[in-house]
Amino acid sequence: MEMASAFTLNVRLDNIAIITIDVPDEKMNTLKAEFASQVRAIIKQLRENKELRGVVFISAKPDNFIAGADINMIGNCKTAQEAEALARQGQQLMAEIHALPIPVIAAIHGACLGGGLELALACHGRVCTDDPKTVLGLPEVQLGLLPGSGGTQRLPRLIGVSTALEMILTGKQLRAKQALKLGLVDDVVPHSILLEAAVELAKKDRPSSRPLPVRERILAGPLGRALLFKMVGKKTEHKTQGNYPATERILEVVETGLAQGTSSGYDAEARAFGELAMTPQSQALRSIFFASTDVKKDPGSDAPPAPLNSVGILGGGLMGAGIAYVTACKAGLPVRIKDINPQGINHALKYSWDQLEGKVRRRHLKASERDKQLALISGTTDYRGFAHRDLIIEAVFENLELKQQMVAEVEQNCAAHTIFASNTSSLPIGDIAAHAARPEQVIGLHFFSPVEKMPLVEIIPHAGTSAQTIATTVKLAKKQGKTPIVVRDKAGFYVNRILAPYINEAIRMLTEGERVEHIDAALVKFGFPVGPIQLLDEVGIDTGTKIIPVLEAAYGERFSAPANVVSSILNDDRKGRKNGRGFYLYGQKGRKSKKQVDPAIYPLIGAQGQGRLSAPQVAERCVMLMLNEAVRCVDEQVIRSVRDGDIGAVFGIGFPPFLGGPFRYIDSLGAGEVVAIMQRLATQYGSRFTPCERLVEMGARGESFWKTTATDLQ
């Protein structure tokens, strides 16, 4: 049976050809290799019809133009040559579209990303809708790749090299008005008239490219270009620490095209695409993409979720305020905040106002839309307005008796079906539910700070939590724009449990004489966004270390912090950034204030600050403990799969994405090699480095956690 075409051609009475993009049985349009023959057949018809005045590409999907190329195509390539051939095929197809003798216009609504934007760039003009769903970008770098169908060559010539480099190197997505301002699109119109606006543009002569700004014209010249690439290269190297080869190749390919012409540029682009597709970094980043997509489809349990019409929040502090914001502004649900102090409510409301007002100032949101979203948030000092809330999120202090009291109050003041979700980071959910009348409706919902930025949430059912409660909580997390993983109700859950030994080891190295900045720089070089000491300062030393005694009580002395160090720091009123002094000293509030290591920290903890370890040795000690604990979490079924473990570490604590997560990283090293490293460290530094039984067994058998493909587990 012949496959239904993703591209269909209709010619209007006014001799404008409409090519409709609609990949059968898929929510999103993605480009696949087999579509090339369909497009070529249409191009042949267009060339044969001498009456045609113009062509319009438009999507039949409600919220996307083309979301990119199908990433599975890259995974199917076994060699760099195969991936290079894939890129050349894409380049050739785009060249054939561009070579049509009549105006070709892309009518864009929704996501126009990757190969989708490359197709739009091959057209002679572009019109997009003013809808918030409309975004344009080249995100290939986030998969360890570069645009392979001409994007590195066409974009700099259209909008200027410095602007194009920013887009390609970061994967930054532009909204409609930004795209218009930069000259990426020719017009922005309401969705209702998108097709007609594109048709009118197609009836005119080919749109002439607008002159580039003076700055971009200077940077396109030999001297300006040399200066630009030197500056951008330095900045990129500092940001990536040399861990992402795609950024270096992007700079090389764009510069080749500008210096030697498009023919050389296309050749360099295809070659680089093929080579990058085979790098371990790209394979790891693609595995994270597939795993996160998979997690987002996971309902959490087999039971159907209950309806979610409104949410309540207990506590208007920083976490409560952030949760209220994502519930109202991302999930679109009415949310009511209860705080015993009216100031807490005001703080929470102001938090959402500040977030939304920032979007209005950046022209990402209309003022009317801001007001509409703010209207979803209300506050109270008692339980008025809570009677029919479907789910209550508790975000009060980490105190077991207080949280148990909250459960009792919710059961007394809310409906029989109301779910109680605790945002605890350390207390067992089973203990919180111990005196509940409806324990099956009590669950953990652990957000990470800052709530609006951190993508992960841990969902923690206790032994008595119902399947429907799990499914409903997962459903809410997804509506809030989060990536949820379901974890077992054991001390520290997953993320904090693997993070604690990593931070403990950093503190231990401080006491041995390593300097704060050396430890942090070593882990940033390894690939973490910030070092462990800075992370502790950012989270708050008091908050971040509160879980250590809980973990030590549950799992023994491998979780013990160096004696008296934490208490010495806290007794000196050092809480980190929030009170201006921790391991670092912070200037006055404001973006320009720089932190610096406080030299007084060394005598305070009885250290000299004259270490002897190299950066790789520092990173090895911290990371190996994290890997060992992650394997224990699989063994104890704290996480349901290594997929969840990799996603939890990357999205929850910034484990280097280019390594694919703890389990991908163990596989890349080999379990046997990890065991050997840990045994060496155990001999040098003590029994906390003893590899767990599961790792030793896997090393002996030569086993791995993942199969060779990006999506399958062993």
Curated annotation (Swiss-Prot):
What is this organism's lineage? Bacteria, Pseudomonadati, Pseudomonadota, Gammaproteobacteria, Enterobacterales
Q: Where are the transmembrane segments?
A: none
**Major location (coarse):** cytoplasm
Q: What is this protein called?
A: Fatty acid oxidation complex subunit alpha
Q: Where is this site: Important for catalytic activity?
A: 118, 140
User: Which Pfam families does this one have?
Assistant: 3HCDH, 3HCDH_N, ECH_1
Q: EC number(s) on record?
A: 4.2.1.17, 5.1.2.3, 1.1.1.35
Instruction: Please give the pathway this protein is involved in.
Output: Lipid metabolism; fatty acid beta-oxidation
Quaternary structure per UniProt? Heterotetramer of two alpha chains (FadJ) and two beta chains (FadI).
3-hydroxyacyl-CoA dehydrogenase, as annotated region: 306-714
Q: Which species is this UniProt entry from?
A: Escherichia coli O9:H4 (strain HS)
The reaction(s) this protein catalyses = a (3S)-3-hydroxyacyl-CoA = a (2E)-enoyl-CoA + H2O; a 4-saturated-(3S)-3-hydroxyacyl-CoA = a (3E)-enoyl-CoA + H2O; a (3S)-3-hydroxyacyl-CoA + NAD(+) = a 3-oxoacyl-CoA + NADH + H(+); (3S)-3-hydroxybutanoyl-CoA = (3R)-3-hydroxybutanoyl-CoA
Q: Does the record bear Cytoplasm in its keywords?
A: yes
